[in-house]
Amino acid sequence: MSSKKNKPNPTPAAKPKQVAQDKQPRLWPWAAGIAAFSFLLYLNTVNYDYVLDDFSVIKENFVTKRGFEGIPDLWKYHSRHGYWNSVGELYRPIPMTMFAFEWAIAPDKPTLSHFMNILLYALSGALLFVTLARWMRDYNLLLPLLATLFFVAHPVHVEVVANIKSRDEIVMFGFATLALFFLHKYLTTNKIGAMVASLVSYTLALFSKENAVTFVAIVPLMMYFFTKSDLKKIVLTTLPFILPAIIFILMRKAVIGSLTNPGETYSLDNILVAAKGGAYYANAFLLLGKYLWSLLVPYPLCSDFGFNQIPLTNWGDWRVLLSLLAWARAPK
């Protein structure tokens, strides 16, 4: 018999790594299914015509209708410069550039633009699922899957897809979600390239629609709830996202000319303008309650909560008080 001792086999040492990889199921097949579901859900809108604000940004916008030649002006002026030659408050050059491309390729053919809305919405839904699944990898995959399906199928998003102008919402959301995707990659790999990609994605979101500026608050919240990062790590990771926001705000100011008063707002566009004093806040809470109710019970829906769609009220309205109570008791 040999006196040599058997040497331990080093192969099992690689198993923990394999197990760690197996913890996260393959996400892209699920993502493809979500994209297909979203695409088919809204495919019937592909033959819709121009509606609502589509006229001011596309069909009756002489800058957009110049096609490729008009693109430089879309970055130099506000988004409705080609519709009315006056002060404007919207600066969304990325979706406007897309509209100019589409007009150049297929002039006055809304089918192409509707198709792009459907496609981009489907892709953003797939990206949302993958991003949520990675941030919530300690949870059952069913949670991000159901959350994404609830999001893409919710009736309040019908107008976003069916109204070509709402491309700004879709593109902004897609880029913001992509920023979260790369941010998670940075937090798990510590690769600077991933952080750069996240910042670039966020910058593109800002130039798609202004409300992406609120993303600066989403970053620390995501890190607080879904990572084990301490306060210092959260603050240091969030700070770089302030720079793109500042750059966008300064560019927007240079184009529009004012941040606080870009032009007069009329009650036909915003009912809160007609509410004075304490009634302003009462109606603001009524609208917040309406948004919450539409999220839970999306019927009936309205394409525009403009003047008199929701008549002005006061603090004696039980709906205002109920809304105030609901938001006051919301989880902090």
Predicted regions, residues:
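Polytopic membrane enzymes that build or remodel cell-surface glycoconjugates and lipids
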Residues: S2-K332
